[in-house]
Amino acid sequence: MRRIDELTAEINEATLELQKIKDQMSKQFKEIWKLQCKKDTGKEYDKERYESLMYNHKLLQMKRRQLITHINYLNKEFFEVLI
């Protein structure tokens, strides 16, 4: 029973972190989209900011994938403990 509680807490923590990452990615995407539109229409845009946002967005994508994999592993372990 103790292991189930530990896994539940870990799953909840990872899920909250995943939601934070999704929120950050959403904010970044909006900013990237605005800069991308300026770039595509030939208007002046902050190239350094754009590249920085793209890099950070890719890092968040990798972190998001890792968290999803971790949550899936925890869920699998959780159900194995239940059985």
Q: Where do the protein language model's features map onto the residues?
A:
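Non-transmembrane coiled-coil alpha-helices
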Residues: A14, M25-Q28, L60, L67
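Short, flexible helical or helix-coil boundary motifs
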Residues: Q36-K39, Q61, F78-V81
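Short E/K-rich amphipathic alpha-helical oligomerization segments
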Residues: Q19-Y55
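Short amphipathic alpha-helical coiled-coil/interface segments
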Residues: L53, H57-L60, R64
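Glycine-centered signal
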Residues: E6, E13, K34-L35, L59
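Short, charge/polar-rich alpha-helical segments
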Residues: M1-D23
